[in-house]
Amino acid sequence: MKFIGAVYLLFLLPALSFNSSYEGLEKKLKEVFTERTGILRHLSKTSKELDSIKGNLQSLKNEDAVPKKDVQRILELSHKQRDEMKSLQAALQKQLDDAAERAEKQQATIKFLKMEMEKKTKIIKDLQQENKSLKNKLLSGNKLCDIHAEESKKIQAQLKELRYGKKDLIFKGQQLMDLENKLKVAKDELEKAALDKESQLKALKDTVHICFSSVLHSQTASLHRFPATPTNLLRYSALVNNSRVTFQQPHMKDIPKVPRITTTSKLPVSSAVMRRESTGPKDCQMVKVGSDCSHNQTESSSVMKKTFGHSQSKTPEQNGQGQARTAEESVKTDGELKKTQSDKHN
C-alpha cells in the first residue's frame, strides 16, 4: 500500500502548480528521492525474501518433504510476483524519469528565473542610480532655476531702470529740442540785432561824413573870404588832416551779441546829428576869424572821435544804453561848443 501511495504521489506531481516557491519544489523533490530510495530498499528486501524462498524450495526438493504441486504453485506465484515487480519497476522508472525531466526543467526555469532576477536586480540598481542622478539633476536644476529667477528679477529691475532712464532721456531730449529752438530764436534775434547795429553804424558814418563835408564846404567858403596866409593854410591843412576819420567795417565775430535794441534809441542819435549838422556851419558863418572856427571844428571833431571810440569800446551789454548816452552827450557837447563860441565872440 505504501508503494501504491508513492506511485499516486508521483502521478500527482504534474498537477502541482508552478506558482509555488522554489524552496517548496526542492523539498518535494527531496521527498520523491527519499520515497524512491525506500521503494528500492523494499524491492531489495523482497528479492532477498524470494532468494530465501528459492533456497527453501530447493531444501524442500532435497528433503522431498514438500509435494511438487505446492512447489509449482509457489514458483508460479513467484513468477507472477516477479512480473508484477518488473512492471512496477518499469512504471517507477518511467515516473522517476519524468520526475527527473521535470526537475531538470524546473531547475532550468529556476536558473532562468535567477538570471532574470539578477538582470532585474541590475536593472533596479541602474534605475536607482538613474533616480539618484535625476534627483541630483533636479536639485541642480532647482538651484539653476533659483539662480535664473534671481537673474530674471535683476534683469527686470534693470529693465525698469532702463525704462525710467529712457523716459528721462526722452524728457531731456525734449528739453534739448526746446533749448535748440530757443537758441535758434535767440540766434535769429542776435542776427537781427547785429543787422540793426550795422545799420546804426552806417547811419553814424553817413552823419559824420555829412558833418565833415558841411564843415569842409564852410571852410572853403571862408578861404575865399580871407587871404591865404601861410599860418591859415597850415591851420586848414591840419583841420583837413584831422577831419578825416577812418572807419573799419566790423567783422561778424567782433559784433557783440546783445538783445534786440528798440528803434527809440535811433531817434536821439539822428536828431543829435542833425543838430550838429545845423549848428556847425552856422557857428562857422557867425565867427569872423577863420582860425577860431577851425579851432572850434577841430575840437568838435576830437570830441566826436572820443565819443565814437568810447561807444565802440564798450561792452556788448552796455551798447544798447551807450547809444542813448551818446545822444545825450552829443547834445551836451553841442551846447558846450555854442557856449565857447559865444564867449569868444564876447
Curated annotation (Swiss-Prot):
UniProt KW Nucleotidyltransferase keyword: no
Coiled coil regions, renumbered to chain: 41-209
Region feature Disordered, mapped onto this chain:
271-346
Annotated region Leucine-zipper: the residues are 162-190
Subcellular location(s): the record lists: Secreted
* One Gene Ontology cellular component annotation held by this UniProt entry: extracellular region
Glycosylated residues are: 19, 131, 241, 296
The residues forming the signal peptide are: 1-17
Tell me which InterPro entries the record gives: Luzp2
UniProt lists compositionally biased (Polar residues) regions at 293-324
> Which keywords has UniProt assigned to this entry?
Coiled coil, Glycoprotein, Secreted, Signal
List, as start-end ranges, the regions of compositional bias called Basic and acidic residues.
326-346
Specify the protein name. Leucine zipper protein 2
Point out the gene that encodes the protein.
Answer: luzp2
Classify the source by domain of life: Eukaryota
